[in-house]
Amino acid sequence: MLQQYTLLLIYLSVATAKTITGVFNSFNSLTWSNAATYNYKGPGTPTWNAVLGWSLDGTSASPGDTFTLNMPCVFKFTTSQTSVDLTAHGVKYATCQFQAGEEFMTFSTLTCTVSNTLTPSIKALGTVTLPLAFNVGGTGSSVDLEDSKCFTAGTNTVTFNDGGKKISINVDFERSNVDPKGYLTDSRVIPSLNKVSTLFVAPQCANGYTSGTMGFANTYGDVQIDCSNIHVGITKGLNDWNYPVSSESFSYTKTCSSNGIFITYKNVPAGYRPFVDAYISATDVNSYTLSYANEYTCAGGYWQRAPFTLRWTGYRNSDAGSNGIVIVATTRTVTDSTTAVTTLPFDPNRDKTKTIEILKPIPTTTITTSYVGVTTSYSTKTAPIGETATVIVDIPYHTTTTVTSKWTGTITSTTTHTNPTDSIDTVIVQVPSPNPTVTTTEYWSQSFATTTTITGPPGNTDTVLIREPPNHTVTTTEYWSESYTTTSTFTAPPGGTDSVIIKEPPNPTVTTTEYWSESYTTTTTVTAPPGGTDTVIIREPPNHTVTTTEYWSQSYTTTTTVIAPPGGTDSVIIREPPNPTVTTTEYWSQSYATTTTITAPPGETDTVLIREPPNHTVTTTEYWSQSYATTTTITAPPGETDTVLIREPPNHTVTTTEYWSQSYTTTTTVIAPPGGTDSVIIKEPPNPTVTTTEYWSQSYATTTTITAPPGETDTVLIREPPNHTVTTTEYWSQSYATTTTITAPPGETDTVLIREPPNHTVTTTEYWSQSFATTTTVTAPPGGTDTVIIREPPNHTVTTTEYWSQSFATTTTIIAPPGETDTVLIREPPNPTVTTTEYWSQSYTTATTVTAPPGGTDTVIIYDTMSSSEISSFSRPHYTNHTTLWSTTWVIETKTITETSCEGDKGCSWVSVSTRIVTIPNNIETPMVTNTVDTTTTESTLQSPSGIFSESGVSVETESSTFTTAQTNPSVPTTESEVVFTTKGNNGNGPYESPSTNVKSSMDENSEFTTSTAASTSTDIENETIATTGSVEASSPIISSSADETTTVTTTAESTSVIEQQTNNNGGGNAPSATSTSSPSTTTTANSDSVITSTTSTNQSQSQSNSDTQQTTLSQQMTSSLVSLHMLTTFDGSGSVIQHSTWLCGLITLLSLFI
C-alpha cells in the first residue's frame, strides 16, 4: 500500500511539473577577464563573465518546473562545475545544469529545475554569473563553420533567450593581433571530451598554391592524434579571428596515425587557403607540444620550407581527478521533440568509458488540412527511428450567416459574432439610414457660437439649431453712375464680417495735363467731398522728337514742329533747298552698269556715281630701238575696246650647238617673249668617241667626257677605284706554297689564292663537365700545327675501400678509357681501437664493438656489473701510428656548416662543422695530397621530464685530439701516438672524466722512441688555422633535484705542441717548421630545473713556412712537447663539487705507455 502511494505521488508530481519561461529577464553585464596570457579579448578567449538577472514567482512557478536559457554562439562554460544554483539570501530556489554546445551544437543551454523551497508566498529574484567562452570557429566542422559568422570585430549584440523572452547586451570584441598572412594555428580544449581540437592554416599565397605539405605531430610522445575526427579543406576567407568561414574540397593525400596527421596537396586556386584540424588526446591537455610541417610553393614563387614547434599551455576546465578517462560522444535519435545532451551513468571504479549522448528527435513532416468545425486536431503518423514521421494538423474554419439592419449612424459597420460551440458564425451589417435635417441659424447676445441638434425618431426630421454671435461691420462709400445716393448691407455668414456699402453720385471733374521732368506719367485725382468738383492732374514726360529733313523748290530753309499727344512722338520737319550735283563714272568688276546718288547734307554737293563694266582690251607688243620697255593704254568710251601698246627692246641671243643623229647641220632660232633670251640652236652630226678606263686612289668611280670641236673625236675617261681583294688560303698536295692573283672587272673583287702544303696535326683528349663528347679542330696558321681536341664526359667512378697490413693509407685511381668506369682503390690501415668500460645494472658483463669508418677509431664498450664500492679503473692506452708526408706548398679552403635544432622547452642543439681542404697546386711536380680536417662544436641541453635526476649519475667523456699531417720527399716514417683513457665511477667520491692525452714521437730508421722539447723559428711565416675535433657524450644527470642553487663545472685543458723538421741543406734555404697550439674547454652547468648544458670547443692555430730550395741531403728529427693542466670534476652524491688536479692522471697515463 505504501509503495502504491509513493508511486502515486511521483505520478502526480510528474503530471503537475511544467515548462515555464521568462525567468531570466535581464542581461546586466558581460565583462572579460584574462584566464591565461591572451594578447587580445576575442570572443573565444576565456573568460567572459555574463551577469544575468532572474526572477521566480511562487504564484506561477512550482517545484519541479523547468526553464531553459538558450545561448547562441556559446562554445563552453569555463568552469569545472557542472551546475549553478539560483540563490537569494542563501536559499536555493533553482538548480541549473550546464550543457555546453562545444563541437556538437551551435549553442549552449542552461537547463534549470525549480527547487522545493519556492512556495506560492515567495517571489525570489537575483543575479547569476556564468563564466563562458564564445564560439567563433576553429575547425572545419559544420558547427564551427556556422558559428564562425556569429560576430565581427568591434561592437556586437549578444542575445540569449528564455522561451519568448530575449535578453541582450552590447559588447566590444577585439580583432586577433596575429598577422593573417602567415601560418595560423589554434588549439581549443573540449572539456566534455577531455580532448583538444587543433587547427593549422597554411601561410597565404595570393595567387594560389602549386603544391605543399602541412600537418602536425607529437614531439615528446605525450600526444595522440584521433584520426576519426579530422577535417581537411580549403577556405575562401577567414574571419576577424583567423578562423575558416567555409570549407571546400580539393585534391590532397592524407597520412594519419596516432603520432601525426599530414596532407600533401596540389593546385590550390587563388583566394583559397588549405587547412587541417584534428582532435588530439594529450597526457595533460593544458601542457603539450606539437611539431608542425610547413612546406609550400606559391604559384609563380619558390619552394618554402619553414617547420616549427609550439608548446601549448592553457587552463583546467575540469576537476583534477577527471583527467585520463576516455569519453565518447554518441548521437541517438529519440522520440522527444527537442535536442538535448546528456551524460550516461559512469562508475570510475567499474566503467572504463564515459559516454555523452546527443539526443536528437525523430524528424517530422507536417501536413496541414482544413474542415468545417470548431476544434483543431493533431494526428501523428509515427515512424521508426531512422525514418521521418508525419504530423497532420486539421485546422477548422466556420461558415457565416449575415444579418443586415439600419441605424442612424453615418457609416456602415460589420460585426462578426463567433460561435464557440458551433461552426456557423453570425455577421451583423448595420447600414446608415439618417433622418432629414432642418438647420436654423440665429444670432444671440453671446460672444460664442453653439450648435444644437434635436434628433427626431427614425423617419422624422432632425433639427439643427445654430446660435451665432453678431458679425463685425465694415462700411464702404463709393461712387456710381446714378444721380442719387443708396446704402446696402451685405450680411456675411456667422463669424464673418458684414459690409455696408454707400453709393454716391459722381462729382464733376476738371482734368489738367502738364509736362514734367520725369520719364514717366502720373495721374493725380484731387477728390472733393460729395457734391463738389474733383480735379484730375496728369503729368506727362516730354514726347520723343523725330526730325525729318526734306528738299523743296524754294531757295531757303524752313523748320516746322508737329506736337503729338502726350506719350506720342513730336515731328520736326526741316525743308532745305536742293544741293548741287557732281557725276563720276568708274569701272568695276561686274558685267553690268549701276548709278548711285550719294546725298550730302543740305548746303553741300551730292555725288552721282556711275559704275560701268570694263571695256574689252587688245594688247599689241612691238620692238623698238630703245633699251627700255613702255606700255601705253588707249581707253575707248564705255562699251567699246581699249588698246594696250607694249614697246619692248630687242632680246638677247644665246647660241647652242648640240649633236643629233643626222649627218647634216641645222640652225633654229627660238624667239623668247620680250625681256627673255632668244635661242639659236645649231645641231651638228656626232663626233666619233674614244673611251679610256684607268684606276685611281679615290674610293669612288668617275666618268669624264672630253668633247672635241664638231667634226673631231671626243674622249671618255673612266676612273675606277681599286677592286677589293679576297685572299683564300687552301692546302694542296705539293710541298711548297704558291700565290695567284685573279683580277676581276672594275667594281668587283679580286681574288688572291694562296696554296699551302698541309699542317702537322696533334690530337688531345680531355675530360669536361658535360654528359656528351665533342671533337674540336683548332687550325693553326700555315706552317704551324693543327690541334684536334676531343672532350669526353667524365667516367663513372667506383670506389673500393679495403684494409691492408701497412700502417698508412693509400689511394690509387685506375683510369679506364673514355666511356668506361674508373676505379678508385683506397687501402686503409686497420682502425685503432679504444676500449671503454661502463657500469650497468645487470649482473653479468658483456662487450660491444662499435666499428668506425676507415681512419676513425673503433670503440669496444665493456658493460660491467656495478657494486656499491668500486675502485676507479683506467683503460690501457691504445697506440695509433700515422705516417705523414711533408709538402712544399699548402693551399687551404675552409667551409663551415651550422645546423640548429630546437624542441620546445627541452632546449636547442647547435652543431657547427668546419671543413678545411689542404691541397698542393698543380704547377709543381709532386703528388697531390688532400687532407680534410673537421671542427665540430656541439652544445646540448639535457632535461629530466620528471624533474628528478636518476641515481645512476652522469658520465661525461671528453676526447680531445690534435693531428698534424705533413709530407716529405723522400718520405721519412713518423709516428704519432694517441692515448685515450676513460675514468668511470659511481656516485661516491672519485673522478668521473679525464681528457685524452696525445703523445707524439719522432722515429727514424735507427731510433726507437724519442721525446724532447724543442722550438724552431723561421723567417717566412704564413699563419693558417687548423681546427681540432672534440666530442661530448652525456648521460642522465646525477644532481639531486632538491638543490636550489645552480652548479657550474668548468674543465679546461691547454696543450702546446711544437713540431719541428730540420733539414741539413747544403744548398742553403730555410727549413720548414710548424707550430701548433690547442686549447679545448668543457663547461657543464646544472640547476634546480634538472637541466645540464655541456659545451666543448677546441681551437688550434698553426703557422708554417716552406722552402723552395732543392733538398739534396735530409736528416730529420720530430720533437713534441705536451703541457697539460686539467681539473677533474667530482660529484660526491650530496651535491658538492670536488676538483682534482689531473697531474696524477697524466702520470698514470705516461706509466701506462710502458706497461
From Swiss-Prot:
Region (Disordered): 936-1115
Residues bearing attached sugar chains per UniProt: 471, 543, 615, 651, 723, 759, 795, 881, 1023, 1099
Keyword check for Transport: no
Keywords, sorted A to Z: Cell adhesion, Cell membrane, Cell wall, Disulfide bond, Glycoprotein, GPI-anchor, Lipoprotein, Membrane, Repeat, Secreted, Signal, Virulence
Comp. bias regions, Low complexity: 949-965, 1010-1019, 1034-1058, 1071-1115
Cited InterPro entries: Adhesion_dom_sf, Agglutinin-like_ALS_rpt, Agglutinin-like_N, Agglutinin-like_N_N2, ALS, Fibrogen-bd_dom1
Lipid attachment locations (GPI-anchor amidated serine): 1134
Protein's GO biological process: adhesion of symbiont to host; cell adhesion; cell adhesion involved in biofilm formation; cell adhesion involved in multi-species biofilm formation; cell adhesion involved in single-species biofilm formation; cell-cell adhesion; detection of symbiotic fungus; endocytosis
One Pfam family in the UniProt entry: Candida_ALS_N
Deletion phenotype: Reduces adhesion and damage to both human umbilical vein endothelial cells (HUVEC) and oral epithelial cells.
Cellular component, GO annotation: cell surface; extracellular region; extracellular vesicle; fungal-type cell wall; hyphal cell wall; plasma membrane; side of membrane; yeast-form cell wall
Effect of residue 851 to I: In allele ALS3-1
Subcellular location: Cell membrane; Secreted, Cell wall
Topological category with respect to the lipid bilayer: Lipid-anchor; GPI-anchor
Consequence recorded when altering residue 634 to V: In allele ALS3-2
One Gene Ontology MF term: cell adhesion molecule binding
Stretch forming the signal peptide: 1-17
Superkingdom of the organism of origin: Eukaryota
Function statement: Cell surface adhesion protein which mediates both yeast-to-host tissue adherence and yeast aggregation. Plays an important role in the biofilm formation and pathogenesis of C.albicans infections. Necessary for C.albicans to bind to N-cadherin on endothelial cells and E-cadherin on oral epithelial cells and subsequent endocytosis by these cells. During disseminated infection, mediates initial trafficking to the brain and renal cortex and contributes to fungal persistence in the kidneys.
Domain notes: Each ALS protein has a similar three-domain structure, including a N-ter domain of 433-436 amino acids that is 55-90 percent identical across the family and which mediates adherence to various materials; a central domain of variable numbers of tandemly repeated copies of a 36 amino acid motif; and a C-ter; domain that is relatively variable in length and sequence across the family.
Protein name: Agglutinin-like protein 3
Gene name, Swiss-Prot/TrEMBL: ALS3
